[in-house]
Amino acid sequence: MISRIRKGRNNKVFLFKKKKEKMIIKEYKSNFSTEYSRFLTEKIFLEFLKKKKINNVPKIIFFDEKKKIIYLTFIDGKPIRRVQKNHLISCLKFLKKINFKTTYNNFKFQNASDACLSIDDHIKTCQVRISKLFKKHKNNNKIDKKILSFLKIEITPSFEKINIEVNKKFSKAKMKKKLNKNSLILSPSDFGFHNIIYNKNKLFFIDFEYAGWDDPLKIICDFFLNPDYTISRADKKFFLNKFIHIFGKKLLNADNLRLILKFHFLKWVCVILNQLDMEISKKNANLTYFKKAVNYFNKNKKILE
């Protein structure tokens, strides 16, 4: 028996059941515009994790490169509802294992999807999403008017204010300067508790189709800001201190975290708003996503101070 358990823009995920046997079938869409192949990214990254003897991830059973399908071991468990320190420690251990004796030279892998290799990249990942939302919501229907109003009143002025701040602090040359390859870390990219399964006091990590080399600060920003879960202020401080202890030598832009975090906060508001396109025929779903974006912004806008 095969049943679909997830439908998204980038892939379809199915659960295969036969008596006591279970496996995950992941089918990657080939017509979705992207710089990298999500199928190859996940396949290569899972093979890399296997070589590193990292076992708390799915294992490849079979793959079909032509059809862009991977059969994976099924991981039983449940999502984490409340983030605790022991969960954060497990996340840190996972990142440390991935990067232990791993360098850009001995693992010639691609950059992560939306990798940020300069201060300018962090700014653009937000700016591009804002621009795309303005272009997508030009219609005069009720939801488009709400989105455009929200973008004009809250998001754009916030972005412009941070942009002024960052331009005062850095020269254009400094903003465009790329990080040295040795300053990057290997990132699962879409890393957070939305992609973690909890089973028998152990965390299992899934979904590596965006993985690659990235600025360590981007991992921190996305891990802290993902709207699907909440990490307390104290736990964020705990995680950050431990992260710096592990990757300290690579955190060349650590003093810039406060500014960079602001751009990624606005980016995440845009990410939520962009989900409206996936449910464009369902007015109630669209309204739900819009409310989620507004609530997320209002709840966390102290970040912009």
Task: List the predicted regions and their residue ranges.
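Short amphipathic alpha-helical segments and their helix-coil junctions
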Residues: 161, 166-172, 200-202, 237-256
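An alpha-helical support segment within catalytic cores of ATP-dependent transferases
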Residues: 103-189
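Activation segment
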Residues: 77, 203, 211-213, 226-229
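Active-site activation/catalytic loop segments of kinase-like enzymes and analogous catalytic loops
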Residues: 216-249, 262-281
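ATP/Mg2+ or Mg2+-diphosphate-binding catalytic cores
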Residues: 270-305
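ATP-binding pocket architecture of kinase catalytic cores
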Residues: 4, 14-138
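Active-site acidic catalytic loop and adjacent metal/ATP-binding pocket
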Residues: 5-20, 24-25, 164-219
